[in-house]
């Protein structure tokens, strides 16, 4: 019995040893489970990436809106262009598989083509621009800009030089004109004094001669003034006008004396009797 008892603990110890050996073997199994989870997570992410290109592959059964609009305008052959309603009706009859938002998309594309100058809008209709009309306005626009830029500085320089010359010439001509008038007045006074003792008829003739003499030098100076500037001739004309008015006033009192008027009335009364 003692021998058996001694053998029992040995077996127990061996079992305990076995249990201690088995326990560390479970840990790598747990690590292996985690690796499986990571692989499954990676597998689920891959189909998401594959779904994105499937959306890009969707193709429309009809051509682009630009092609459809131009085809409608060409086939309709309207002189003043095709309206939006006519283009819409033509496309709907020709292409049956259109999206439900076709009318809105058509309007948006029409506005876009007009903005990009691929179509021309006339009132409420649309036309394809001709090759001549599209080519001619582009080179014409820069030529006009260059002409205006070159013409502006020349016009300003000419305008600045012209008034400067006109002012300088006006200042130079106004002063000698005043001197000439003063000289004419001085010459007229001594002649009037000499002829004071003579009868009235001679004095009138002398005054007219003095006016004629004073007017002659002014007449000679007028062409010189006219050659320099056009504004110089105007003061000469104004000075000559009062001389003529004075002569008219002197002749008027001589004509106002009418002696024959009472004689005519007497003759008419005699005829009535």
From Swiss-Prot:
Q: Which residues form the H15 domain?
A: 61-130
Where does it primarily localize? nucleus
Modified sites of kind N-acetylserine? 2
Q: Which CDD domains match?
A: H15
Q: Supply the PROSITE patterns for this chain.
A: H15 (PS51504)
Residue stretches of biased makeup (Basic residues): 33-59, 257-273
Which UniProt key words apply to this protein?
Answer: Acetylation, Chromosome, DNA-binding, Isopeptide bond, Nucleus, Phosphoprotein, Ubl conjugation
Cross-link (Glycyl lysine isopeptide (Lys-Gly) (interchain with G-Cter in ubiquitin)) at residue(s) = 156, 165
* Gene Ontology BP, a term: nucleosome assembly
Q: Name one GO cellular component term.
A: mitochondrion
Write out the ranges of the annotated region (Disordered): 1-63, 193-273
Supply one GO molecular-function term. DNA binding
Question: Which of the residues bear the PTM Phosphoserine?
Answer: 14
Query: What is this protein's function per UniProt?
Result: Histones H1 are necessary for the condensation of nucleosome chains into higher-order structures.
> Which family is annotated?
Belongs to the histone H1/H5 family.
What is the name listed in the Swiss-Prot or TrEMBL entry for this protein?
Histone H1.2
Provide the taxonomic classification. Eukaryota, Viridiplantae, Streptophyta, Embryophyta, Tracheophyta
